[in-house]
Amino acid sequence: DEYNLFPAERIEKDYAATQILTRQQRVVFDDALYIDLGGEASEYTAASNGKLTAYMMMHELDFVVTSDEVLEYYKDTFPMEDLEALLPADLREALADKLFFNTDADGKTTAIALDMTQSRFVAGTGADADPNVQHTYYFFVPAGAPHPEQIVQFLRYSFGL
């Protein structure tokens, strides 16, 4: 993200320290992908979009944190998990006011994303009140994400729950 609210290397290290991992397991966060819908970085955006699509199709991606404008672009393009179905009851209740709902072409409404404004990455950093930060950042889970239990754990970590 352009404000470095979600620095992958730091999040990877901090989150991994909260997990019990075997030698074969590792936590990977990738912030090298960049989607610019304004056309400023069109070649890089196309490459990032292709990589993101490939990760989703191969079911190698657990979640994405992105701006409101990129979520708006992807919400009707990529199938996303319904967070109300994915989250356990206690987490669903705690995060209910942060859910972002979308109605698809068939009229089905699902919780496709989660507003990250009150997460440890944004709240209290000043970014949540900074007028220069022009986007809201959302967490979404592509359909077929391979590690749903880790998604739940990461959200608990993100919101201190």
Where does each model-flagged region fall?
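A recognition module on extended beta-rich or small alphabeta surfaces enriched in W/G with H and D/E
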Residues: T103-I112, T125
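Short amphipathic alpha-helical coupling segments at ligand-binding clamshell hinges
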Residues: P146-Y157
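Extracytoplasmic "Venus flytrap"/periplasmic binding protein-like
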Residues: A47-G107
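Extracytoplasmic/periplasmic/luminal assembly and interaction segments
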Residues: Y3-L71
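A bilobed periplasmic-binding-protein/Venus flytrap-type ligand-binding module shared by bacterial periplasmic
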Residues: V133-H147
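Long, glycine/tryptophan/cysteine-rich extracytoplasmic
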Residues: D115-Y137
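Short, flexible loop/turn elements at secondary-structure junctions
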Residues: E2, L33, L87, A143-A145
